[in-house]
Amino acid sequence: MAKEEIKIIAQNKKAYHDYFIEETYEAGIVLSGTEVKSIRMGKVNLKDSFARVENNEVYLYNMHISPYEKGNIFNKDPLRTRKLLLNRHEINKLIGYVTRKGYTLIPTKLYLKRGLVKVELAVARGKKLYDKREDIARRDAKSELEKHFKEKQLGI
């Protein structure tokens, strides 16, 4: 069987910096035709976007999809609210997470899978400033250690 081809269109790198990612879900997204064309061209921004559960449905807010140049009257508002498509049991799990204090839903990736636009939705918990500093210090120490071993291996 052929390997599933996934083409990542946009990533929310800031989410990994600002949040602890607990769990991720794959969700479909309701889009218009011109929005899909714009997404395929890579004109999308996930930076300040987030999701909420309302009336047992999940909606994505602040995801900016630039208007398609040739779409004229068919273009929608770039920041409009978009519905996410998830199974009922997944939505119930998300409701359980979000009702806990400090948890939120953040889109981390937007990608094409078998020709369909999908969103990777993460259940996330906000990081405090000292957590961010800790991560930066850990990353710096790791890169310094790798650099040291590489120099030792090469005999420099």
Curated annotation (Swiss-Prot):
Q: Which UniProt keywords apply?
A: Cytoplasm, RNA-binding
The molecular function terms of the Gene Ontology recorded here are: RNA binding
Q: Name one Pfam family in it.
A: SmpB
CDD domains membership: SmpB
A cellular component term from Gene Ontology for this protein is: cytosol
Gene Ontology terms: biological process: trans-translation
What's the chief localization of this chain?
cytoplasm
* Location of the protein in the cell: Cytoplasm
The entry assigns this protein to a family as follows: Belongs to the SmpB family.
Cited function: Required for rescue of stalled ribosomes mediated by trans-translation. Binds to transfer-messenger RNA (tmRNA), required for stable association of tmRNA with ribosomes. tmRNA and SmpB together mimic tRNA shape, replacing the anticodon stem-loop with SmpB. tmRNA is encoded by the ssrA gene; the 2 termini fold to resemble tRNA(Ala) and it encodes a 'tag peptide', a short internal open reading frame. During trans-translation Ala-aminoacylated tmRNA acts like a tRNA, entering the A-site of stalled ribosomes, displacing the stalled mRNA.
Protein name per UniProt: SsrA-binding protein
Source organism: Thermoanaerobacter pseudethanolicus (strain ATCC 33223 / 39E)
